[in-house]
């Protein structure tokens, strides 16, 4: 969705859009995808060349559990407040090395329109928790055979150590005896 800069005033103009899951490609490395429509609504204001967007995004995202890789659905409600400046003005600002706190919420627009799609995608990804678990007591996968330990115990011997660590274990035993 594009918001035309020329149509905006200081009083503000409301906007709303519903994205289909295939319209927003989330990060494949994050193993995240939309499971249904994502809605965005808010208002856009213009003060000089600066455009300020404030609003809310609602979506449901499916991610993989960090321990057992099971699919986990996360409902997200994200509020945003972002200022946009023209691409040319942003190029002038980036000549300074120091980033001021006032510049932290700045993004750039070009061609006299603000592209809302990338903002929505970024805000959804930023709202994802850093630790994604199917449940707090998730046992994860067996490091030897890969069995899901939530479904039951596997046949692997507990306490087995990797043979690559045997030299360190020998050194530890020798240092205890000395």
Where are each of the predicted segments found?
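Structured interface patches
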Residues: 1-178
């Amino acid at each position: 969705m594009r918001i035309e800069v020329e149509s905006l005033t200081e009083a503000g103009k409301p906007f709303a859009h519903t994205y289909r899951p295939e319209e927003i490609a989330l990060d494949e490395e994050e193993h995240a995808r939309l499971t249904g429509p994502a809605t965005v609504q808010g208002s856009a204001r213009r003060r000089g060349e600066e455009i300020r967007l404030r609003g809310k995004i609602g979506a449901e995202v499916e991610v993989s559990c960090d321990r057992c890789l099971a699919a986990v659905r996360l409902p997200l409600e994200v509020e945003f407040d972002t200022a946009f400046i023209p691409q040319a003005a942003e190029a002038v600002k980036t000549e300074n090395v120091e980033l001021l706190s006032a510049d932290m919420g700045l993004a750039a627009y070009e061609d006299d329109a603000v592209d809302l799609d990338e903002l929505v995608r970024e805000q959804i990804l930023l709202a994802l928790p850093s630790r994604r678990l199917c449940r707090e007591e998730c046992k994860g996968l067996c490091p030897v055979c890969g069995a899901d330990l939530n479904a039951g115990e596997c046949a692997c011997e507990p306490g087995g150590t990797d043979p690559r660590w045997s030299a360190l274990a020998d050194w530890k035993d020798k240092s205890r005896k000395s």
